[in-house]
Amino acid sequence: MSLLLEPNAAMIKEQKLYREMGLTDEEFARIEAILGRLPNYTETGIFSVMWSEHCSYKNSKPVLKKFPTDGPHVLQGPGEGAGIVDIGDGLAVAFKIESHNHPSAIEPYQGAATGVGGIIRDVFSMGARPIALLNSLRFGELTSPRVKYLFEHVVAGIAGYGNCIGIPTVGGEVQFDPAYEGNPLVNAMCVGIIRHEDIQRGVATGVGNTVMYVGAKTGRDGIHGATFASEELSEQSEAKRPAVQVGDPFMEKLLLEACLEAVKSDALVGIQDMGAAGLTSSSAEMASKGGFGIEMNLDLVPQRETGMTPYEMMLSESQERMLLVVEQGREEEIAAIFAKYGLEAKAIGKVTDDKMLRLFFHGEVVAEIPVDALAKDAPVYHKPSAEPDYYREFQAMPTYIPQIEDYNRTLLGLLAQPTIASKEWVYDQYDYMVRTNTVVAPGSDAAVVRIRGTNKALALTTDCNSRYLYLDPEMGGKIAVAEAARNVVCSGAKPLAITDCLNFGNPEKPDIFWQLEKAVDGMSEACRTLGTPVVSGNVSLYNETNGEAVYPTPVVGMVGLVDDLSHVTTQPFKQAGDLIYVIGEAKPEFGGSELQKWLEGRIFGKAPELDLAVEASRQRQLLTAIRAGVVASAHDVAEGGLAVALAECVIGASGLGANVTVSGDLVSELFSETQSRFVVSVKKEHQEAFEQLVEAKLIGEVTNDSILTVNGEHGGTVIRLSVDEMRNVWKGAIPCLLKSKD
């Protein structure tokens, strides 16, 4: 749209055109009061993206304040591109997770690819070198042709971007449920390493300092992407395909290397990714955080399309772009660094002292807005919250106990469920060994990546059981954090901190806002008990299709520190004769379980309980035993219960089996998803030392016959399956579903 065709300020108000941009009548009146006049079209667009939920967190900010964000190792908490945690030796780990849900629902390949690109930029904008990528994905049932299409193209998009830029995708999780049929979730996490002295901030300070634009040229892709991400999906969403950006990983690789060189220069004052809301958010946020203003001449913005208006340039979300603030008079030093990589660093403005965002175009002022009004003073809403009827119904239900006649068939059936089945089809498309630092590849409890130049490693995981959260958001929130910590501990690492991605429905509905509040309450309590502060994160609301919300899905990305590479532990059993222990007892807890969903076709009842004090104690005991060198393998008991955990321990082993005897109620012992449980194998010579350190029950030993045998305590074998049969079912489930013709 040319400037001549843009509606004038009076038309915007009279025709309520601001509503199409996502602003309410009250918000527009507030803008008028802030400016002391009616906003023009460009200013209305700028306010609309900065006041969207995606950029401002206006509906979630009161809830986010509940998270613990401080800790002895935290160097940077929420509010910057990524959180940063000290790991010793003058090094730190920078990490963050973000969503790209709405774009991936419309254009799955580019939506997923640009989600990866954006989170990488968040990490290297802090001055950190990205060393690993993870993801957390949710889709509907794989029997749906539409879901197959989304799944295949999202995975291809993640692989295409990560593989090209040369950062290993080392881990993640994928779950399938009808709740995500129309609204898939695509959350991408990036982890980087940084020296303390290289940490950068996204600030604009120093009057007269130069604002520089680097990276790809600006086009019309992604305009109003932030607003699009703050709406429910509907039949009309397909028309918003232009709001999905297009990524170029090769450009990003050049930008990454140039930025990491530039951060070594003291000429650089501040740096920020042009992510959601592009040039608008990067300039306004940097100025607001620094306590200054920014003035830009939009005629100088590099453009790849002709006739772009100020509105289009400011709202474009073209990828692979960064905004820099550079000391006045030292622009050439920075420009020379970028020129080495074939990139132009273009001066487009300067820092001012009046706390205003002022934009010039063709010699005229086209926008003049207080930066704080766009950033830290954006509206905040305290939404009404109400416990939903379904929750009260579920809480009142009697305990669900499944009836099982054939234990072999039940275990094979669970191994074939896509949420439990092998994700090899997914991670085989990822280059998870590039840079040669990957110690534990995808498929174990957590990925482990070596920290080059040290004897340490990082354990990385993403976790969230959305079904538990639907049944009981507070308990489910606790479990999400606890399970992430469990996975990290099973890998031989001490949990350090988390990043979170809060994926929920429409917060304007009281029952959805209640889910958000309760989930954050549970997560916060778990973070405090387990000593894992929240250092970064993202909120993705309005994940609904035609009024149907996804399950509450607050994904936890956790980083743990392995302080000695010899402590790295994996889930497969290691050798015949080793003793098998289970830590933790089973209760009849099947609400939200894989077994319930498979047998009944739906979930209901109460989620499993979690005692955080017990959880913390068991994790401490297990980590102490691992560090003492008396644990051969460790695996947490999660979806599918103990039977699935044992199957996974033998499937991953080479030529080994297991013979175990379980006591008590067999259905609960084998298939309940009771929390705070682990399967551990121990060499016989370490039996006494292990039993002194850990409260655990000896249930059997590893065999060399490639058969999983499970006996009841009163005699009688209830499960006897060859490892090959289990492996074939487990590995073949997802490829078979993708090949099937509906």
UniProtKB/Swiss-Prot annotation:
Intracellular or extracellular location(s): Cytoplasm
Cell wall biogenesis/degradation found in the keyword field: no
Keywords associated with the record: ATP-binding, Cytoplasm, Ligase, Magnesium, Metal-binding, Nucleotide-binding, Purine biosynthesis
CDD domains: PurL_repeat1 (cd02203), PurL_repeat2 (cd02204)
Record-level GO BP terms: 'de novo' IMP biosynthetic process
The enzyme's E.C. designation: 6.3.5.3
Quaternary structure and interacting proteins, as annotated: Monomer. Part of the FGAM synthase complex composed of 1 PurL, 1 PurQ and 2 PurS subunits.
Family according to the record: Belongs to the FGAMS family.
Protein name: Phosphoribosylformylglycinamidine synthase subunit PurL
Organism: Geobacillus thermodenitrificans (strain NG80-2)
Lineage: Bacteria, Bacillati, Bacillota, Bacilli, Bacillales
Underlying gene: purL
